[in-house]
Structure formats: structure tokens, C-alpha cells
Amino acid sequence: MASQGTKRSYEQMETDGDRQNATEIRASVGKMIDGIGRFYIQMCTELKLSDYEGRLIQNSLTIERMVLSAFDERRNKYLEEHPSAGKDPKKTGGPIYKRVDGKWMRELVLYDKEEIRRIWRQANNGDDATAGLTHMMIWHSNLNDTTYQRTRALVRTGMDPRMCSLMQGSTLPRRSGAAGAAVKGVGTMVMELIRMIKRGINDRNFWRGENGRKTRIAYERMCNILKGKFQTAAQRAMMDQVRESRNPGNAEIEDLIFLARSALILRGSVAHKSCLPACVYGPAVASGYDFEKEGYSLVGIDPFKLLQNSQVYSLIRPNENPAHKSQLVWMACNSAAFEDLRVSSFIRGTKVIPRGKLSTRGVQIASNENMDTMGSSTLELRSRYWAIRTRSGGNTNQQRASAGQISIQPTFSVQRNLPFDKTTIMAAFTGNAEGRTSDMRAEIIRMMESARPEEVSFQGRGVFELSDERAANPIVPSFDMSNEGSYFFGDNAEEYDN
């Protein structure tokens, strides 16, 4: 495992805090959750939502999006400088769903961004509370990761669509800060860097002048974030090469794609956080629960306990399966899009099935969809056990895995051996062995080839009963290894593309 001494814990990233002890961290994360909850309650009042309507996940998403848009300074500035017809840069809004005469109706609401900012700050004791905004971004990102497979985006940057287990956080906005960087997968970082290098190849001035200097600083920072995710010296040394390149070009793109592939076996450490929709925090705060006083952690039992006691509803299209919709949201809430399905199933206590077998589309409803036939149902977000979220990629061993996703990225700290199809992965490493990174490449390939099952399974704590809040009695589940566990395998999930 990479030395953790120099890194801040998630919660410190989450709250932009300096070194704090566990109690202070739990309190500051709790304070962030309180703020989101208070904001949500106020918005439900403004919008005159009934209790049921306030617990509707689609309404939650609209309200979350409104506040994120109100605080998106870059985009707001851009919109004011480039006015587009029919779009008021000072307003934000979206669809709000209400129950009228036994039917669901869609109502488009519009608010001044200034007003939304005022409500948000008021709910957060006058602060901008960036941590709370980032928290909502990560929830949206986790939902996207669970709903869509990024095949097209991978292919566009020259990567293999089967590397989708590396793509956590690929839809997070750039402004998501340290907490956002922590949850981005290796593939996401590689993709961002490749896009940057391609711009540099196509635009002579990209690295030049005052702007170019800022670009260069951003490039090196992204390289360092990616380097910090790798756990072997050779992978890190290769990242140093990429970062120090005077004029990044195709050689660097090659190196980055090589590194992304290597991460299927020599996995990076990627953080996982359970970020829940605002409509879960709102009712909890309304019922008098004081998150700051009680303390809260995004990586422990707290989100599981909160979901055990929450009622969340969702609109359901005529041919969708409510149980499948529940699975989608459960996975998003637990940041488990790239976890092994056997582990998720064990923790959830009901079978978690691959994306392609789910009869459900995304959670959001498009503006042209017919509301007349729309029903609603309760989302089942409870779990049988809980487990600590991990930030280690674990190691891997030779197991048969599938034709689609060829690896996973563990979410839960649970001991298991990891499925991946070594032959498939190693076949991708033919070709370029010369050039300035040849010795590192050779070393990385050697490590991948010698990955042996016994020394490289994922060592975790195990799962815990929900009554075991102190994580005192780990239960180590045994998994049927004949069954592999990728979520996106042999798959036809919709594409995420704006």
C-alpha cells in the first residue's frame, strides 16, 4: 500500500481541514451534512412540496443541480459573456414533480441563482460550504458511474472500452477539489491528461504564454494526482517521465494508455465515499437528528444506518422494474459501481445483477417523456451488513473474468480474491518496448506476469452486522469463485454523453 502518512484522510479532504483528530473530522463532516439537510428542507418549503414529493429522488436531483449551477462561477461568467438565446444566465431551475389528482405532473421551476445562493449560505451558517457542494457532485458522479458505461469516451481517447472499471468519477466537474480528485479512478485521470495533451498537439499556443504557464501547472498537478494513485515504484517513475516531458505529445499518450492498462492488474488506490441524495439528509435533519453533534463518516457505518431508516421514492416508467431501480440507486449510494457483484450482493443481502440485466433506465426523466403513464415506488436502499469503504486498489490474481469489464475496483474493505482475466489483459501488452520508458515498462510487465494468487488477493476487514457499530466482529464471507463479478460485463448500458 502506498505510504499513507503524507496523505490527508478523506474526511480532511472532504472538509478542506488541516490535521484533525477523528472526533473533529466526524463533527466537521456532520456539519456539512447538516447544511445540505437544512438547505433541502428550505427548498422543499419554497417549492411547497409535500413530504412524499420531498422524498422523491428526481426532485432531489433537480434541487441539487440548481445549487451546483448557482455556485458554478466559471460557467456563470461564461454564460454572462456569451449570452445564448432563451437562457437567462442569472437563473437556474429544472423539473419538479408533484402529485396532482392521483397523477404525477411535471412543473418547470426557475429561480434567481442569487436567491439559491442565499438559501444555501443561510443553511450553512453564512459560509459558501464548498465541501457540501462537492459532496453533491460526488453523489451525482456515483449515480452516473452506476447508470452509464463510458465506452464511447474511452474509445475516443484511444483506450479500450473494457477498461471501464478504471473510470470512477469520469463525470465529476473539474472544480470538485481534493475530495473529487480522491475518488477519481486511474482511467479518469488518464483520460483528462490525454485530452489535455491532444489539445496541445492541435493548438500551438496551448502551452505558451501566461495561459500556457497555468495550463502547465494544471498538467503537472494532474500528473501528481495520478502518480499518487499508483502503488508501485515503476508506475510512479513512469508518471514522473510523463510529468517532466518538455512538450507532451504522442509518446506521453502511449505511456498513459500503457499505465491505464497496467492498472487493471497493479491497481491504483481510489477513494470511495457514500454520498447520499439531499432528500435523505433533509428528513433526517427535520426529524431533529444533529449530525454535527453525533458525528458522521462517509466511509463507515453511518451511511448504512441512515439508509436503513430512510424512505426515498422514485418515479418509475411503465416497463421498469422497481427492484432494479432500487439496485441502481443502492449501488450509487454506496459508490459500488465497480465493486465485485459477489461482494455487493453479500453486503446488500439480495442478489446484485449486472447492468445489462437491469430493466431500468437512468433515474432522471427527460423533458419529453410522457408523465401520464408514470408511476412511483419506494426505493429499497437497506443492507444486510455493512463494510468499511476502502481506498486501496488491493492486488489481483488469476481468476477467470468476463468478456466485458475485465477487472474491478474494490469499494468495500472485504477479503476476497479478485477476478480478472490475465490472458486478456496481458494480450494488450504486446508492441512498443523501446523508448525512454522501456525499462519501466519491462518492470511493470514483469510484475503483472508474476502476480500470484496467494499473495495478491484483496486483504480486507470483512463485513459487519449492523448492530456492530464499532466493527468489532468481522465476518469474512466466502465467495463462489466460479462466478465472476463485473457489473458492466457483456453489457449494453446506455452511454453517458452530454
From Swiss-Prot:
Keywords of the record: Capsid protein, Helical capsid protein, Host nucleus, Host-virus interaction, Ribonucleoprotein, RNA-binding, Viral nucleoprotein, Viral penetration into host nucleus, Virion, Virus entry into host cell
GO MF annotations, alphabetized: RNA binding; structural molecule activity
Motif Unconventional nuclear localization signal per UniProt: ranges: 1-18
Locations listed in the record: Virion; Host nucleus
SUPFAM superfamilies to which the protein is assigned, alphabetical: flu NP-like (SSF161003)
Protein's UniProt keywords contain Ribonucleoprotein: yes
GO biological process: symbiont entry into host cell; viral penetration into host nucleus
Region (Disordered): 1-22
Record-level GO cellular component terms: helical viral capsid; host cell; host cell nucleus; ribonucleoprotein complex; viral nucleocapsid
Quaternary structure, from the entry: Homomultimerizes to form the nucleocapsid. May bind host exportin-1/XPO1. Binds to viral genomic RNA. Protein-RNA contacts are mediated by a combination of electrostatic interactions between positively charged residues and the phosphate backbone and planar interactions between aromatic side chains and bases.
Role noted for this protein: Encapsidates the negative strand viral RNA, protecting it from nucleases. The encapsidated genomic RNA is termed the ribonucleoprotein (RNP) and serves as template for transcription and replication. The RNP needs to be localized in the host nucleus to start an infectious cycle, but is too large to diffuse through the nuclear pore complex. NP comprises at least 2 nuclear localization signals that are responsible for the active RNP import into the nucleus through cellular importin alpha/beta pathway.
Compositional bias (Basic and acidic residues): 8-21
Main localisation: virion
Protein name: Nucleoprotein
Span of the annotated motif Bipartite nuclear localization signal: 198-216
Gene responsible for this protein: NP
